[in-house]
């Protein structure tokens, strides 16, 4: 997919957070599957606007149902634990405020989630310590999902 125009991105984002007045869109490069933009609002709030590639994920509806189910489970579970904002941060999706034909077609499905400040994406660990930290976080994530009910 070619980059999307600013006016198209603004219209898509408005389906999720109406009248937010996005200040800017920055395409995040490096991914090979989805098309991803960082959205900065004039208020300072930041979001990710992403087009999921339906050619790679043919059951996007099922994918998003699982994502919402896991997010809700983590939110509930973490709310009963000691408040430590750095303990585990995860994607918190923004459901569409209104449906639009432009949110999905046979190739792309658009979604929005809150930007997680201070997080970096890597394709490989830069050191054994970084690999250990990533593995430890993934293990914690898995343990938090151990009691996730079946759909």
Regions found by a protein language model. Give the residues of each.
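Conserved ATP-binding subdomain of kinase catalytic cores across diverse folds
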Residues: 24-151
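Juxta-kinase regulatory segment immediately upstream of eukaryotic protein kinase catalytic domains
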Residues: 1-26
């Amino acid at each position: 997919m070619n980059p999307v125009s600013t006016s198209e991105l603004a219209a898509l984002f408005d389906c999720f957070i109406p009248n937010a007045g996005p200040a800017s869109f920055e395409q995040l490069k490096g991914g090979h599957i989805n098309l991803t933009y960082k959205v900065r609002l004039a208020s300072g709030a930041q979001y990710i606007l992403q087009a999921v590639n339906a050619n790679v994920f043919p059951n996007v509806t099922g994918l998003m149902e699982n994502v919402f189910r896991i997010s809700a489970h983590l939110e509930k579970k973490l709310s009963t634990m000691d408040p430590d904002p750095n303990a585990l941060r995860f994607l918190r999706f923004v459901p569409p405020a209104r449906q639009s034909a432009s949110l999905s077609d046979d190739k792309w499905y658009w979604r929005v989630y809150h930007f997680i400040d201070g997080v970096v994406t890597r394709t490989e660990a830069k050191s054994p310590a970084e690999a250990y930290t990533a593995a430890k976080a993934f293990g914690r994530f898995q343990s938090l999902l151990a009691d996730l009910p079946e759909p």
